[in-house]
């Protein structure tokens, strides 16, 4: 498959009926497809024949699709499935009605600063969640950002991300990315960290503000500019952009990764602060509008050809237009991309509290007047705090398991990083319920001598939001390879770092304050002790440990979960 390949519209690909070609790129084609087994409409990415036959890429995609599947953040496009059919690799994603940011910029020209900041804030939230899970994206660019009609933004194409927990696959790694947005260290032998994503997102912010990437020209000149050329100042390129944005761009695009912002959240907060006061309120209004838009959930049944997905409900009180006016760029012939189901993601953001925490760090310009969400169905996945852990699952799930972990325990980290995504999927599908238990018997092995107890306490602060997906996401993030402390290490994590981790997965200010205050330390000690007693009742003392209700689970067998849920 290449750029000149014929469309496969109307053909069958395994269980998928390819309805419409909606995108074509160097890695393959994207189709609107009907999954005839699960009876749903999806976005199906078919990788090119060249990549499908490349063993290095095959290994990369298998690893990265699993990494992407672990991310439970509303601005990350969810991956349903991935695999291979007749020698061709594919990724099955949820479908969205939206247009990519590159097409938007070509059509409309530069964005008003409040809108640019609001979109970057949402993508930064997605990236921070990925970084907390041990993944980097490596190809942040406008083409990989989808924006719905109500300005809800999504980051796509985590399939070529590089999980920092995995051994590098350098044969292909040197070619991943787009020159206009690549950090200087990507062109050298230096190890590229997650801060390369922060650099790329800053380049995207610059382009949103000015209409053009920071550096332009042929490949060699763009590479050289990223490495040696002075960082451009957006205020000198487009009249009316506040001078304060110059410092934001300068830090986000610093040549030395250590001089950049620590997180994408820091970048977006600085960008918001650079706005004029009135525009800060407009940016907050745009975020509120995107998060509270109400949409019906698309039907899971096959849709007849020509049927259109529901459009986002416009927000009644749109922000005044930003000046000065600019002439839009020539209209592109490129069609909007139909992608991941915005309706489902927005509903999740509303019901689960995983959306942007508007109360922090940005001010709101007025009270929120959205109607309360409807009550969940009786069989919905729910969260219950127990005396020795936290239950997450549906009352109709046929199997309930107990999972015991210790925040410092290295094998626990490996276990969670390997199986969290599959467990979360089984819970969401109501095939499985989980009682999560966190112990603290390695406190003495931590630098602070109480890290495990503090991590357990943080988990109960997050559980207090009564959001099952949020809790599972935070539980998994505690074991991220770039977050979990090691035994007898020279340092561990502070309460502020635990609070920031909670913020990256979508925790509300009340949970963050709870973590910083240490208010739940006593509760954590009691519940960790109770969990240890429960574990002892299974004639076990070490972690990780999994109990299926009748016997010990051999999680060393990669098929253990599939066997458990049938």
From Swiss-Prot:
Residues 16-275 form the Protein kinase domain. One of its GO terms (cellular component) is plasma membrane. Its main location: membrane. The active site is at residue 139. Coiled coil: none annotated. ATP binds at residues 22-30, 45. Residues 296-330 are annotated as: Disordered. The keyword Cell membrane applies. Induction: Induced by nitric oxide stress. Repressed under oxidative stress. GO terms for molecular function: ATP binding; protein kinase activity; protein serine kinase activity; protein serine/threonine kinase activity. The keyword Secreted does not apply. It is a single-pass membrane protein. This is Serine/threonine-protein kinase PknE.
């Amino acid at each position: 498959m290449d750029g000149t390949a014929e469309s496969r519209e109307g053909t069958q690909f395994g269980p998928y009926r390819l309805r419409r070609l909606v995108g074509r790129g160097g890695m393959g084609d994207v189709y609107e497809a009907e999954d005839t087994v699960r009876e749903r409409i999806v976005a199906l990415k078919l990788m090119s024949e060249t990549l499908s036959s490349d063993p290095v890429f095959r290994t990369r995609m298998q690893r990265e699709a699993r990494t992407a599947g672990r991310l439970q953040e509303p601005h990350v496009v969810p991956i349903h499935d991935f695999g291979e059919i007749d020698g061709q690799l594919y990724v099955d994603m949820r479908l969205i009605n939206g247009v990519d940011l590159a097409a938007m910029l070509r059509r409309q020209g530069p964005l008003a600063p409040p809108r640019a900041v609001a979109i970057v804030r949402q993508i930064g939230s997605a990236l921070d969640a990925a970084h907390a899970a041990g993944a980097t994206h490596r190809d942040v660019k406008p083409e990989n950002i989808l924006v719905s009609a109500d300005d809800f933004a999504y980051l796509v194409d985590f399939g070529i991300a590089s999980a920092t927990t995995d051994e590098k696959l350098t044969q292909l790694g040197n070619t991943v990315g787009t020159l206009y947005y690549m950090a200087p260290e990507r062109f050298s032998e230096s190890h590229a960290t997650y801060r390369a994503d922060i650099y790329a997102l800053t380049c995207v912010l610059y382009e949103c503000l000015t209409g053009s990437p920071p550096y332009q020209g042929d490949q060699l000149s763009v590479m050289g500019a990223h490495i040696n050329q002075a960082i451009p100042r957006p205020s000198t390129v487009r009249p009316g952009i506040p001078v304060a944005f110059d410092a934001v761009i300068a830090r986000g695009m610093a040549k030395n990764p250590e001089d950049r912002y620590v997180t994408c959240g820091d970048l977006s907060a600085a960008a918001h602060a650079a706005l004029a006061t009135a525009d800060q309120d407009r940016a907050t209004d745009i975020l509120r509008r995107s998060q509270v838009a109400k949409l019906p959930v698309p039907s899971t049944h096959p849709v007849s050809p020509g049927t259109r997905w529901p459009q986002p409900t416009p927000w009644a009180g749109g922000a005044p237009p930003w000046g000065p006016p600019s002439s839009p760029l020539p209209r592109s012939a490129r069609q909007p991309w139909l992608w991941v189901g915005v309706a489902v993601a927005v509903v999740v953001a509303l019901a689960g509290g995983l959306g942007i925490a508007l109360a922090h760090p940005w001010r709101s310009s007025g009270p929120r007047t959205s109607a309360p969400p409807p009550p969940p169905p009786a069989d919905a996945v729910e969260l219950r705090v127990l005396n020795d852990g936290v239950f997450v699952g549906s009352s109709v799930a046929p199997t309930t398991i107990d999972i015991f972990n210790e925040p410092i325990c290295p094998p626990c980290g490996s276990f969670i990083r390997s199986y969290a995504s599959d467990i979360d999927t089984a819970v969401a599908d109501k095939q499985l319920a989980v009682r999560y238990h966190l112990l603290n018997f390695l406190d003495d092995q931590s630098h602070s001598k109480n890290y495990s107890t503090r991590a357990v306490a943080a988990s109960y602060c997050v559980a207090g939001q009564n959001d099952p997906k949020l809790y599972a996401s935070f539980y998994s993030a505690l074991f991220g390879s770039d977050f979990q402390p090691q035994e007898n290490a020279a340092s561990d994590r502070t309460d502020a770092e635990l609070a920031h981790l909670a913020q990256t997965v979508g925790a509300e200010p009340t949970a963050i304050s709870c973590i910083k205050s240490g208010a739940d330390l006593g509760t954590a000690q009691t519940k960790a002790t109770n969990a240890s007693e429960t574990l002892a009742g299974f004639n076990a003392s070490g972690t990780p440990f999994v109990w299926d209700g009748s016997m010990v689970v051999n999680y060393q067998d990669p098929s253990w979960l599939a066997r458990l849920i049938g």
